[in-house]
Amino acid sequence: MNRSKNIDSIIDILGENKAIDILKIDVKKLTSTVDFMIIASGTSTRHIRGLSEITIAEAKKNKLMSIGVEGQDGSDWILIDFGDFLVHLMLPKVREFYNIEKLWGFESVDINHSREL
């Protein structure tokens, strides 16, 4: 599976598992460390942990291995590193506070399922 399909597959998995405000950001021109970031919110720490576990398990089925995971133990922000793209899973209040979309030069937007910037 190519990178674009991997990213789309993860976005689909997040949507199917009730993640909210899913956003894909192209950061290739802003950093040399990753090409894309997927940002999504969950309704509780249990929900974002479940989202992270499902994302990692489904990625493995497609032979996509995560390099690392930060914040899985009861955190309100979990980061999954897939090498050339990252997945940020956060509680809405944490996402609003850190507003990493704006930090990377993008304005926050309200979306129903997914949106690409």
Language model features with spans:
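Short hydrophobic/aromatic beta-strand micro-patches
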Residues: 39-41
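Active-site beta-strand termini and strand-to-loop segments that position acidic
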Residues: 80-82
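Catalytic metal-binding acidic patch
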Residues: 35-37
